């Protein structure tokens, strides 16, 4: 009986990415390389919700990794209707969702709208040293970034970061960060179509990606330093991947080397979870951090699935994937590696 208890996880959580729902017929993606199943993405979400509800160990929460509805909804002004349809399905599960924001959130809505919507799950995070999307008097602050952290269990923490902190699509034109982002993008990408990586040495500098500002990097440093001191295991979560071996290089955070440097310098970091690259990829970097990019629901054929449940143990996390998401056993960083600073 004791051994059985020892095998039980500390907690579990669900993961789903790039639902990109729209009430539209199937069509090819931007690059014409794969089919997008717009209506079926809602069916895929329903299947995930039903399975999570039936699991013997109920997930403590669900990570929704961004791009919850597709930007195509703006063509017939159906963004709010599409979002409501998705949220209705999510609300059928009596479990909290933690949302990150991707490029399609910003195709459909302003940052201010998102801040006041159900896609702002900051209130579910710790109130100490949070990234914040509001000023001290409670008013919306467009210069802030959407990021927070929470601890579902002692010795474990999740840090959600804003990959579109520096981005022309993630900021209003009146924002100083908009000008900084646009100037940087045009400096790196001379193409007329800023979504095109043609001829670029740094192919991540396209409009559908974004960057992490110095202020957010400083905030991440503070949170991770605190977690180092507490000897916590930290999962960092974002829409955009940060490791070239865990995604198509065209899908990375603009300043991914800076972000990686921060993550790899903190022994508390055990994993980085992302979406955006719909085919999904995985790697473990030289510091023992697991970089897991989840397959996108939107490009998952109707006969398959694309979601997973992570089981968290003292020394490892075990992913039970469905369909395109593979099962994986991911051990935490070796104590010797943890002691080495970047």
UniProtKB/Swiss-Prot annotation:
Q: Which keywords does the record carry? A: Hydrolase, Metal-binding, Zinc
Molecular functions per Gene Ontology: ADP-ribose diphosphatase activity; CDP-glycerol diphosphatase activity; metal ion binding
Q: Which InterPro entries match?
A: Calcineurin-like_PHP_ApaH, Metallo-depent_PP-like, MPP_ADPRM
State the source organism's domain of life.
Answer: Eukaryota
Sequence positions that bind Zn(2+) 2: 67, 103, 239, 276
CC cofactor: Mg(2+)
Write down the CDD domains for this protein, in alphabetical order.
Answer: MPP_Nbla03831
Task: Please give the family membership noted in the entry.
Answer: Belongs to the ADPRibase-Mn family.
One Pfam family matching this protein: Metallophos
Q: List ligand-binding residues for Zn(2+) 1.
A: 18, 20, 67, 278
Catalysed reaction(s) here are: CDP-choline + H2O = phosphocholine + CMP + 2 H(+); ADP-D-ribose + H2O = D-ribose 5-phosphate + AMP + 2 H(+); CDP-glycerol + H2O = sn-glycerol 3-phosphate + CMP + 2 H(+)
Question: Can you name the source organism?
Answer: Xenopus tropicalis
Subunit details for this protein?
Monomer.
Q: What EC number(s) does its UniProt record assign?
A: 3.6.1.13, 3.6.1.16, 3.6.1.53
Task performed by this protein: Hydrolyzes ADP-ribose, IDP-ribose, CDP-glycerol, CDP-choline and CDP-ethanolamine, but not other non-reducing ADP-sugars or CDP-glucose.
Q: What is this protein called?
A: Manganese-dependent ADP-ribose/CDP-alcohol diphosphatase
